[in-house]
From Swiss-Prot:
Transmembrane segments: none annotated. It comes from Listeria monocytogenes serovar 1/2a (strain ATCC BAA-679 / EGD-e). The gene is ribC. This is FAD synthetase. Belongs to the RibF family. Disulfide bonds: none annotated.
Length: 246
């Protein structure tokens, strides 16, 4: 998968493409449904492009702490998006300047740089300054450019909305099985282990301080955003299973 990093409009790309747009934190079942819909629309000569945003707008603009933490920091998100069929990821840095982009500018100055036949987004998608513009406006703004727009309904399972927010809440409570049911794939923590401590986890949502069973043995999540592990030094990955009772 090709990855481009931009701060405002994407670079011009003449390749025919179908586009998806979103934060894609976790690349959960809802995201996968959007991606699969885009893949079903995409013609053989087209690529699947995704525009994603980092950091979360509510962290970038208002420093709301819970939105700093992610299910899948950048490298993990890229890995899952590639796995689910994205050919070109445009990773957009969300800043106060970017937040001033109007809906009209987003379409005329950003999307028209891409050779798009169709855009697929979630039904709750909003965009542009104030985030008060919806799929209907996106569809209207894209009509003059002959770009189709499809919205994918929100998915629920067991009366729980599949969303990154709900999955992060499950992780914080140590409910990993419930989180993975909404993710549709395993959830891993990847970090650097040195002298029995996994660090570099500042961007991850982590479960509460405690002792947990993982696929690599028992670990302790500390209150300073490190995990005590019995693993050799270097880059390691943990698959959390469940919290152990005291």
């Amino acid at each position: 998968m090709e990855v481009s990093h931009v701060t405002l409009a994407p670079n011009k790309d003449s390749r025919a493409a179908v586009l998806t747009i979103g934060k894609f934190d976790g690349v959960h079942i809802g995201h996968q449904t959007i991606l699969n819909t885009a893949l079903s629309i995409k013609k053989e000569n087209e690529i699947l492009t995704a525009i994603s945003f980092s950091p979360h707008p509510l962290w970038a603009l208002k420093q709301i702490e819970i939105y700093r933490e992610m299910l899948t920091p950048r490298m993990e998100k890229e890995r899952w998006l590639a796995y689910y069929g994205v050919n070109h990821l445009i990773e957009t840095e969300f800043t106060s300047r970017y937040a001033e982009t109007t809906p009209e500018e987003f379409v005329t100055d950003h999307l028209t740089n891409l050779n798009l036949s169709h855009i697929v987004v979630g039904s709750e998608f909003n965009f542009g300054k104030g985030r008060d513009s919806d799929v209907d406006l996106l569809r209207d703004l894209c009509k003059p450019y002959d770009i189709g727009v499809t919205s994918v309904p929100v998915i629920e399972t067991n009366q729980t909305k599949i969303s990154s927010t709900n999955i992060r809440a499950f992780i914080r409570r140590g409910h990993f099985q419930e989180a993975e049911e909404l993710l549709g794939h395993p959830w891993y923590i990847t970090g650097i282990v040195e002298n029995g401590e996994m660090t570099g986890l500042d961007d991850y949502v982590l479960p509460a301080t405690g002792t947990y069973q993982t696929d690599s043995g028992i670990v302790n999540v500390t209150n300073n955003r490190t995990i005590e592990v019995g693993l050799s030094d270097g880059l390691q990955q943990l698959h959390m299973k469940n919290e152990l009772s005291e």
